[in-house]
Amino acid sequence: TRSVSSAASDVYKRQIDEACIPVITGFQGINDVGDVTTLGRGGSDTTAVAIAASIKAERCDIYTDVDGIYTTDPNVVPEAKKLRSITTEEMLELSGQGAKVMQVRAMEFANRYDVPIRVLSSFKEGEGTLITKEISSMEQPIITGIAMQDNQTKFTLHGVEAVSYTHLRAHETERN
C-alpha cells in the first residue's frame, strides 16, 4: 500500500543519509489485496527501479551478467557493439521486442518516474550503458538496437516505430 511504500522510502532515505547501506530483497511485492507475491522474471530490476524512484535517487545501477546494452545479442552476433547510452523509450521498445537485458516492467517504471539506469557487469569493471530519458542528438545513432526472437529480427530506428525484418520482407514480396 502507499503508506507502507512511503514509510519504507523514509527509512531508506534516513539510512542513506546516515551513510548506511540498506540491503533490500527484490523480486517480491504486495498485490492489491495485501498479500506478498513474487514479481516474476526481472522482478529484482523492477524492485530496484521502484525503490530508486521512491527515494528520488539520481540513478539506479543494475549489476548483471553482461557489461551493458549491445546493438544486438553478442552471443549470436560477436561483432555486436556495446552502447554507451540509450534512451529509456528505446530500451523499453527493445525489451518489449525480446531483448533480455532489461525487463519491460522495470523500463516502464524508469520511463514513468524518470529514473536513469546504468547497466553494469557484476563480474568486470567498466562504464556499462546509461539508460536515460534523453540523449544528445549528436550521440544518437540511427539504428539503436536489434532484437531477435522466434526467427524474427526487430530493429529500433531513432525516431521510427519498431519494424520487424519479416514484416518488411512480407511487404516487399507483396509488391513483386
Enumerate the language-model features and the residues they cover.
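Short, mixed-charge, low-aromatic patches
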Residues: 9-10, 61-67, 123-131, 161-165
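Short, charge-rich amphipathic segments
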Residues: 23, 96-109, 132-147
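Single conserved hydrophobic/aromatic residue that forms the stacking wall/gate
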Residues: 1-8, 12, 167-170, 174-176
